[in-house]
């Protein structure tokens, strides 16, 4: 019964309502409930394609990519999603962190440093996150001296 409802929703989204972001998000949730993670990820990708500036769709897509293992190491697709999130929400901590990681991973330590300094400036100095970012920045400095 549930499978049939999800199949009908998928058919409607694919054939009649491709620009309906909320429909794609509903379909992704339905696929997730059914433990069909690949199809959920594809539906979230369609939601982002339908409206690349929709923060909730971007965040859901980023979370799904992260769950699929695309955040360690950071995949180009995950980094692109984080860049899109920054366009909508320039102070998004998670996007700043992962874009710094991607920049470091691709050898652009200057860009990594910029992302992480911006992130660290937003965090309370007594927080664990602040110190984690500080350690990442120190790691960049040490790597640059070797």
Model-derived features with residue positions:
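Alpha-helical segment of the N-proximal tetratricopeptide repeat
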Residues: 1-34
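Alpha-solenoid helical repeat scaffolds
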Residues: 7-10, 14, 45, 83, ...
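Structural marker of alpha-solenoid helical repeat scaffolds
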Residues: 15-16, 50, 88-89, 122
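Alpha-helical adaptor scaffolds
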Residues: 21-33, 38-88
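Canonical tetratricopeptide repeat
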Residues: 26, 60-61, 98, 132-136
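Register position in tetratricopeptide repeats
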Residues: 33, 67, 105, 136-143
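TPR/TPR-like (Sel1-like) alpha-helical repeat modules
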Residues: 104, 109-127, 138
């Amino acid at each position: 019964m549930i499978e049939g409802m999800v199949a009908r929703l998928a058919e409607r989204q694919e054939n009649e309502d491709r620009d309906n972001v909320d429909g794609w998000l509903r379909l992704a949730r339905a696929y997730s409930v059914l433990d069909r993670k690949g199809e959920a990820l594809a539906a979230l990708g369609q939601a982002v394609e339908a409206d690349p500036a929709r923060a909730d769709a971007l965040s859901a897509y980023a979370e799904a990519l992260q769950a699929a293992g695309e955040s360690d190491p950071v995949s180009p697709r995950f980094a692109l999603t984080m860049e899109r999130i920054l366009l909508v929400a320039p102070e998004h901590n998670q996007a700043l962190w992962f874009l710094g990681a991607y920049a470091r991973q691709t050898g652009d330590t200057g860009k990594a440093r910029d992302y992480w300094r911006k992130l660290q400036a937003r965090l309370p100095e007594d927080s664990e996150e602040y110190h984690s970012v500080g350690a990442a920045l120190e790691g960049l400095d040490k790597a640059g001296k070797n």
